[in-house]
Amino acid sequence: MIYYQNGSSQHNLSHEDLKKSLIAALDKLGRKHKILAIPPDYTRLPSRAGELTEMVWEYYGNTLTDILPALGTHTPMTDEQISHMFGKTPRNLFRVHDWRHDVITLGEVPAEYVKEVSEGKVDFSWPAQVNKLLVEGNFDLILSIGQVVPHEV
């Protein structure tokens, strides 16, 4: 479902363009009570996901209870990196993803499908895993901000 679209390869979105777009999309989602935002980590700084995350915090206020940068297997972000990427977003909202201990398995991607999409390069099932906060946090909205997509480790 598309909540809002704007821009093209010939148009650079300004801060105000981003804010207007984000607010239009969030307005359509309606009122929420407990929100988790999952932006990319510092390695994706140019994506402007930090700017968007700060706007999400400004929009939702205290209902944005957790921010879980999608570290994957990267090292946790430093305070300086968080400040640089996420501006004035409160530091107490940030959680660190521990990929060795904080993941739970939701299910399994069947070997047949893995083989099909990998064009025969991989022929075994793959666990579908997420950080346990997504399941145990009782969120009524989980926002994937920017270039966060599931992938293998």
What are these regions (language model features)?
Residues 1-17:
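N-terminal amphipathic/basic leader segments beginning at the initiator methionine
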Residues 20-36, 61, 137-138:
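Glycine-rich phosphate/diphosphate-binding loops that line cofactor/substrate pockets in enzymes
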Residues 34-45, 68-72, 142-144:
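Short glycine-rich or small-residue beta-strand-to-loop segments that form or flank ligand, phosphate
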Residues 77-153:
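An acidic, phosphate/nucleotide-engaging active-site surface
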